[in-house]
Design a protein with these regions (language model features):
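Conserved inter-motif catalytic segment of the P-loop NTP-binding fold
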Residues: 5-19, 103-104, 118-122, 147, ...
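ATPase catalytic-site recognition across NTP-hydrolyzing enzymes
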Residues: 2-77
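C-terminal nuclease/phosphodiesterase catalytic domains that cleave nucleic-acid phosphodiester bonds
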Residues: 35, 39-44, 81-85, 91, ...
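Short His-Asn-centered micro-motif
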Residues: 75, 134-137
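Gly/Thr-rich phosphate-binding beta-strand-loop-beta motif of the actin/hexokinase/Hsp70
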Residues: 65-95, 209
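Conserved phosphate-coordination/catalytic loops
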Residues: 52-54, 109-114, 138, 161
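A general structural signal for well-ordered alpha-helical packing
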Residues: 38, 71, 87, 116-119
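Nucleic-acid-processing active sites and adjacent nucleic-acid-binding tracks
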Residues: 91-134
């Protein structure tokens, strides 16, 4: 409105905490869900189908593949040492060919001490990830500095685009049906709700962690592409085309 100045400086910061304290807002969010929270609390209604990451694009699995080309962890850290509305989110993804599988997730409103503990616990759960990407923002560098002697494979991730730009970059992977979520995981519904509302949901940590995982995976996927196999497929296609042409000539 005219003359209104929004003094908030961080994503998820409350406008009037003296009227609606953090605990009350969190309780409302849990009861309403991500979709209703965006409409009722943020006054940002979003269509059920639409936006960058549409709900009906996701694929689902009940059993993981026996092996992957590689597995990695992705972490989105909070901005403060105190428990606030900002979430810490860690995800594990397995990559096999053109497909990716969401293996597990841990998420909470933690200070840096609890965040470090959760990173250690998550890293010790199978299937194990050799690389663990942490965005070079918020508490990310501090967590790496604290845990580098305890947890192997911690790597800084330096985003080259905005949150929306990153989501647009990986959206075609979802739209093409190459991203699989665990059908029965309790956190999947909240993940898809946040993704469907992105970037208008109050919290975007799950989407940010997801996009970071897939952008970090791009160079690793190129390493696992077998050029000989691709050449074999192309040669096979040429032979089949030649056979069809010869058959037509005989007719």
């Amino acid at each position: 409105s005219i003359g209104f100045q929004d003094l908030r400086t961080e994503d998820g910061e409350l406008l009037a905490p003296e009227r609606f304290p953090e605990g009350a807002v969190v309780a409302l969010e849990k009861s309403l869900g991500a979709y209703a929270s965006a409409a009722q609390l943020q006054q940002r209604p979003s269509p059920r189908e639409g936006g960058i990451l549409q709900r009906d694009w996701w694929q689902y699995y009940t059993v993981l593949p026996e092996k992957f080309d590689f597995i990695l962890d992705s972490w989105d850290m909070a901005f403060k040492d105190l428990k606030t509305s900002s979430y810490v989110c860690g995800q594990r993804w397995g990559f096999l060919g053109a497909d990716s599988y969401f293996i597990s997730q841990v998420r909470g409103q933690w200070d840096i001490v609890e965040t470090c503990r959760q990173v250690v616990l998550f890293s010790e759960k199978p299937p194990f990830a050799s690389r663990k990407y942490v965005e070079d923002k918020a508490n990310g560098p501090a967590v790496i500095a604290i845990l580098k002697k305890r947890v192997g494979g911690l790597l800084e991730f330096h985003p080259k685009d905005s949150k929306v730009g990153r989501a647009n970059a990986v959206a075609p992977l979802v739209e093409s049906g190459n991203v699989y979520l665990p059908e029965h995981a309790p956190w999947v519904k909240e993940f898809t709700e946040e993704a469907g509302l992105f970037p208008n949901a109050r919290n975007n940590d799950q989407v940010d962690t997801f996009t970071q995982a897939h952008l970090a995976a791009e160079p690793l996927r190129k390493r696992h592409t077998n050029v000989d196999d691709l050449e074999f497929l192309l040669v096979g296609e040429r032979k089949s085309w030649k056979g069809v042409a010869m058959g037509n000539n005989r007719l």
